[in-house]
Amino acid sequence: MWKTLHQLAIPPRLYQICGWFIPWLAIASVVVLTVGWIWGFGFAPADYQQGNSYRIIYLHVPAAIWSMGIYASMAVAAFIGLVWQMKMANLAVAAMAPIGAVFTFIALVTGSAWGKPMWGTWWVWDARLTSELVLLFLYVGVIALWHAFDDRRLAGRAAGILVLIGVVNLPIIHYSVEWWNTLHQGSTRMQQSIDPAMRSPLRWSIFGFLLLSATLTLMRMRNLILLMEKRRPWVSELILKRGRK
């Protein structure tokens, strides 16, 4: 198994594999998100308490879920990079960090907009909101560490250590609404009372965000591989082939 993984992690091979998957994932993400958003924003019934303002859920919840999901994936990659010294694992951490940061920012902004009518303010130092803000700072810290060192191996090690330290924040985000008395509503997935006509497009949106994050990660992986391997012969050959086209 590890032999196969190491073979797949060879830069030219991984670059090629990413290229195979990107078009299909991109098409799938556009289709799934289009279905989820048209269904959710256009055809799902209005909420009996919040009216149409609840529809921001189709943007907020997927972004919030995958802001944590991406970080968990980064933690797995960071562990592999630190333990088995796989350069491509460190590269995966660097590839996912900006995407996770954007998803976290979207979750915070949409959450504030959604909470304004109910809380009477754009921001409260609620346990869920504060821990999600900490997650954004962790993403920014990982990005900063990756760019702070010229040595990619050292940069990957430093970023990986920060990622693993920050994992403790994930259960705090998830269980904050259960551990503390917070203003934030309970986890959406736990609320079985939600109307199926609202829940189905939400699931499409969540899956669409997953496909989108995978697409963007693979695109960034290809760019980072080229940047890291820019002095290798295979990159020069690739540039020449593209130039002939």
UniProtKB/Swiss-Prot annotation:
The GO annotation for biological process reads:
cytochrome c biosynthetic process; cytochrome complex assembly; heme import across plasma membrane
**Which InterPro entries is this protein grouped with?**
Cyt_c_assembly, Cyt_c_biogenesis_CcmC, Cyt_c_biogenesis_CcsA/CcmC
Give its localization.
Answer: Cell inner membrane
Enumerate the UniProt keywords alphabetically: Cell inner membrane, Cell membrane, Cytochrome c-type biogenesis, Membrane, Transmembrane, Transmembrane helix, Transport
Q: Got any disulfides in this one, which pairs?
A: none
Stretches in topological domain Cytoplasmic = 1-20, 85-90, 150-159, 227-245
The entry lists its GO molecular-function terms as: heme binding; heme transmembrane transporter activity
The membrane topology term of the UniProt record is: Multi-pass membrane protein
Residues assigned to the Periplasmic compartment are: 42-63, 112-128, 181-205
Instruction: Note the superkingdom of the native organism.
Output: Bacteria
Q: What does this protein do?
A: Required for the export of heme to the periplasm for the biogenesis of c-type cytochromes.
Q: Which family does it belong to?
A: Belongs to the CcmC/CycZ/HelC family.
Q: What is this protein called in UniProt?
A: Heme exporter protein C
Which species? Escherichia coli (strain K12)
Print the organism lineage.
Bacteria, Pseudomonadati, Pseudomonadota, Gammaproteobacteria, Enterobacterales
Its encoding gene is what?
ccmC
